[in-house]
Curated annotation (Swiss-Prot):
Sequence repeat residue intervals: 9-85, 100-178
Identification of the protein by name: TATA-box-binding protein
Gene3D superfamilies associated with the record: TATA-Binding Protein (3.30.310.10)
Its biological purpose: General factor that plays a role in the activation of archaeal genes transcribed by RNA polymerase. Binds specifically to the TATA box promoter element which lies close to the position of transcription initiation.
Pfam family, one: TBP
Species, as recorded: Thermoplasma volcanium (strain ATCC 51530 / DSM 4299 / JCM 9571 / NBRC 15438 / GSS1)
């Protein structure tokens, strides 16, 4: 099993722009089940069941999609929103650029970790480890630019990636560094 196959994507956050300006009150009527309370939050919230995602739509035309487990679900979500808005005669772009903002993934090193030893070996300039504050070790990888949270159980959470390949690179990198110093 490759490293990529052992990585589980938990959440992809992506953004796009559907128009220069959107009338959220009108969209709230067009999207059944949407939540729009401008006195509470400036955006409209719309949750989909398939794929199981949520979108935040703003007056500026900006849209954030969250909850996707893969990029195809992000694309499907945006397409569904576009189709529903067009069906309600709301003008939106046909094929907007989608920008991945963050990918959160988990990985299991399949070995218990001594986080104190790891904190010393990875170098204090890239590591935060305060077990009284948080049970995980925060490791800021410089290339690719992601953050890994390492836990004593061997579980690793990766955040800050823009592409799936960055997660795989970071996992391979930390595994090599820990193997080099005999910590896994």
């Amino acid at each position: 099993m490759s490293e990529r196959e052992k990585i589980t994507i938990e959440n992809i956050v992506a953004s796009t722009s559907l128009a220069e300006h959107l009338d959220l009150s009108r969209i709230a009527l067009a999207l059944d089940g949407s939540e729009y309370e401008p006195e509470q939050f400036p955006g409209l919230i719309y949750r989909l069941q398939d794929p199981k995602t949520a979108v935040l739509i703003f007056r500026s035309g900006k849209v954030n999609c969250t909850g996707a487990k893969n990029i195809e679900d992000v694309k499907r979500t945006i397409k569904i929103i576009i189709d529903k808005l067009k069906a309600a005669n709301i003008e939106v772009y046909d094929d907007p650029d989608i920008i991945v903002q963050n990918i959160v993934a988990v990985y299991d090193l399949e070995s218990e970790l001594n986080l104190t030893d790891i904190a010393m070996s990875l170098g204090l300039e890239n590591v935060e480890y305060e077990p009284e504050q948080f049970p995980g070790l925060v490791y800021r990888v410089e290339e690719p630019r992601v953050v890994l949270l390492l836990f004593g159980s061997g579980k690793v959470v990766c955040t800050g990636a823009k592409e799936e390949s960055e997660i795989e690179q970071a996992v391979i990198k930390v595994k090599k560094e820990l193997q080099k110093v005999g910590l896994i």
